[in-house]
């Protein structure tokens, strides 16, 4: 048990079961802080489950059982962290946990099977999990809620096996088994009648791939034909960097806004939109500052601390919740303090890596494992390299027209889609630009075996890596399905490369092989 960074054998905390042996001792101050935040999380969970309708939902929906693992997920993402890094993680993750609890509460409030609050349901617009919620930035009286976010996306972060049942259900009904398991699981939830039913209407987007379009087709038909909920298909252009598609993209946003107004009776509020736009710009400036910091010898906000928070704040929040700007300020203050003191997250930094490709969702804390086990610093990842465009903040006729194009740009540049669509420049060329900017000596390239967009460029990635003399490590996975390649299977691909090619020994040998196949 150690206060100093890197003194503990973190692998010794693991068991063959679902939870670890004990909590980590981080020194008195950090241990008390971590325990206080653990109590805070337990308070959120207790407040959630005290409502009778949420107890009913726990018994009705299979995927709700995964939320018992919320504290364990936080523990996985704080392994080995001390000082400012521990506080950055809790500032981000605890806010995300609170936001997901509110999302669940709202879903069950309007759900016809659970709360059946019909008046509230009339103010709900259902949105895709993989969709930018920018189209809701001008509706202060409406709730843009995603059913897929808690049922599949967050569930797999909590429990690596959460989506397995729904993947199997989708395939039992004839859906192809070689498509991305994320939309397949989402379709399985709908087929299994395991999604809350509520809302005045729904907005679906053509993200992020053909598998998503397949899933949207299954889900939208059930919404329209069985539940009587009209669905708008927002078709964002694929060539999103081209100027000649932006007018079409803007018209799609106008059509989506008109659709929402028609089915909810609410009108777009420009004052509220520009409030949200200002908050988006604030968050963007902070994110750019953190990325600039990561280009130095003392990166501060990286790995899971960057990836999970960016996904939530950028795509799901879109400036609609002021608490996220407050969190940005706290995170930045902590990062600046650690940077001035030249602090490091681990006892040794050996390699600077760019993480590219579609992240293994059932093993998101892999980014922290890289630092703790091998001293590989994940400076940034593909899903965090999203739009840094400043949105127009002028509430004038000209500013309002520009705002429509800004919303369209955000929709085109949602996380993952902004790289898997748009041509080889955004996926291939910009990777090597980032390698130079961040002074990286290594690229860890996720090879999501069901993602055709990235797999088709395998050879081009290798050719460029050889040309530039960069270590390129392929890590194969199947996103939501740990049965195909397990967490240890993911780790082994790094272990083999580091030992055979780099001729290195791990910083913490206890982390090299973990028996976590049954772990949440």
PLM features: residue spans?
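Redox- and metal-dependent alpha/beta enzyme cores, enriched for Fe-S-associated oxidoreductases
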Residues: 119-121, 129-168, 354-423, 427-431, ...
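A charged, amphipathic alpha-helical module
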Residues: 11-124, 250, 254, 258-389
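Hydrophobic alpha/beta core scaffold segments
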Residues: 136-137, 370-380, 395-406, 410, ...
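Extended, charge-rich low-complexity interaction segments
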Residues: 178-194, 258-279, 406-428, 501-520
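Internal, well-ordered alpha/beta segment that forms a basic, Gly-enriched binding/recognition surface
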Residues: 193-293
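Gly/Ser/Thr-rich loops at beta-strand to alpha-helix junctions
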Residues: 125-134, 206-214, 356-363, 449-456
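Generic N-terminal leader/targeting and pre-domain segments
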Residues: 68-199
